[in-house]
């Protein structure tokens, strides 16, 4: 009988951004986003969890090295040491909140991990994080 496990890989990336919506006035942006309308950066902690049945013959359902390579290609190379609004074409015109960033990362990973992708968790700070499960 195979058992289902959840495997999580953690990565850290540094990105800069500002929270600003072109759909709002400057005053509305200031009211909603406060000082975050100015450019600033974060050392984001990303945790990607995949879920699957352990294969008896190999004792795992996915080699962690494969997950690490997918994360590097689909996420880290795009976001690490980048300005999210200026350097990531797919994020143009999107307010780069942690919520939207978690959805973006899910969308980048889903084609490669669709049978296994369970959760994307991003810690913006030690106390603030977002979890997205594809819903």
Swiss-Prot record:
Record's cofactor remark: Binds 1 zinc ion per subunit.
Pathway assigned in UniProt: Cofactor biosynthesis; tetrahydrobiopterin biosynthesis; tetrahydrobiopterin from 7,8-dihydroneopterin triphosphate: step 1/3
InterPro entries: 6-PTP_synth/QueD, 6-PTP_synth/QueD_sf
Active site: 36, 81, 124
Residues holding Zn(2+): 17, 40, 42
One biological process term in Gene Ontology: tetrahydrobiopterin biosynthetic process
GO cellular component: mitochondrion
Enzyme Commission designation: 4.2.3.12
Cofactor(s) recorded in Swiss-Prot or TrEMBL: Zn(2+)
The organism's place on the tree of life at top rank: Eukaryota
A Pfam family it matches: PTPS
Family according to the record: Belongs to the PTPS family.
Subunit structure and binding partners: Homohexamer formed of two homotrimers in a head to head fashion.
Additional information: The active site is at the interface between 2 subunits. The proton acceptor Cys is on one subunit, and the charge relay system is on the other subunit.
Protein name: 6-pyruvoyl tetrahydrobiopterin synthase
Native organism: Dictyostelium discoideum (Social amoeba)
